[in-house]
Amino acid sequence: MATDFPAEISALRGTLEQITAVTDPDALRARIAELSEAAAAPDLWDDPDAAQKVTSRLSHTQSELERLDTLRSRIDDLETLVQLAAEEDDADTLAEAEAELTKIRTSMGELEVRTLLAGEYDSREAVVTIRSGAGGVDAADFAEMLLRMYLRWAERKGYPTQVLDTSYAEEAGLKSATFEVKVPYAFGTLSVEAGTHRLVRISPFDNQGRRQTSFAAVEVIPLIEQTDHIDIPETDIRIDVFRSSGPGGQSVNTTDSAVRITHLPTGIVVSMQNEKSQIQNRAAAMRVLQSRLLLAMQEEENAKKKELAGDVKASWGDQMRSYVLQPYQMVKDLRTEHEVGNPSAVFDGDIDDFIEAGIRWRRQQQTVRESATA
């Protein structure tokens, strides 16, 4: 069936106008002016961390505005291309228009998903922790596979990351790993990845070649900001120091530079060992602890709302995705039903479709809960 280009182009323009109304270009321009002024301050780089946040937010906000303008221009160009194909009755030009229509739909979908990230902390940078679960050495290996998957995803998108802590398992893989994704909206984007991930495969660590099911947990928290005012009394924490370790339990540092902070009232434990000094690891651990406490407060509030709605199960993140390598190959999200038959691509960071489906699914769930309490 021939593509109805006028209808498609009209629909694209309508969607873009809806996105524009939500995004508010005037507000973006005002934010760009504000950040540009901050970026021009002569003392900006006196605090490198704060300076990096300012420049990152400026670049991101400029990119948001540019994407709106670029999409509008691409739709105009597509309309011109379709007219040219009709005038010249050129099949090649028509095929080019079909291809461009597909690309614009994809770009529009990505931009539309961004408008769904309207949660209180969605615009924050993210701290991601991966922990091996049941499954022994296979689970530890799976945790390392997931770490590589997320770092590759960030690398492909040009997002800066920093690995804060890695705790290696004895035989292979990781007990746990924590890293930051230093870009605005990283939390809103990656929070749909939180939950239990399951791997099914023939174990490379089993001499009998048996199929093994293993698990890993992914936690995603918003990075704390100075304006959050999360005060932690010294009496509420216990700080332990130890030597950083590498694969197989080998010590990689001759000094006690690694830090473990335990928040006594909640039992939350944060370890950091990838910075060079104990002071740096302590500062990083405190920042992550504050972020986890911030998220815990939000989750407590969300639990109250769910109880009012008659939904006492806060389990959307549990058992969220299966990665099956044998006897067949399939990666499937158990919430959204989105699935692909190429696990290799997924483990190489090709997870945008899963994330987009998760964000849309989450918004649908929120709408249902809001309707139940209306």
Curated annotation (Swiss-Prot):
Segments crossing the lipid bilayer: none
Q: Gene3D superfamilies under this entry?
A: 3.30.160.20, 3.30.70.1660, Release factor
InterPro entries associated with the record: PCRF, Pep_chain_release_fac_I, Pep_chain_release_fac_I_sf, PrfB
The cross-references to Pfam families, in alphabetical order and at most eight, read: PCRF, RF-1
Give residues where N5-methylglutamine occurs.
Answer: Q250
A GO CC term? Answer: cytoplasm
| Modification note | Methylated by PrmC. Methylation increases the termination efficiency of RF2.
User: Is Cytoplasm found in the keyword set?
Assistant: yes
What keywords appear on the UniProt entry?
Cytoplasm, Methylation, Protein biosynthesis
Subcellular localization, as worded in the UniProt entry: Cytoplasm
GO molecular-function terms, A-Z: translation release factor activity, codon specific
Q: Which family does it belong to?
A: Belongs to the prokaryotic/mitochondrial release factor family.
* UniProt function note: Peptide chain release factor 2 directs the termination of translation in response to the peptide chain termination codons UGA and UAA.
Q: Please report the name of this protein according to its UniProt entry.
A: Peptide chain release factor 2
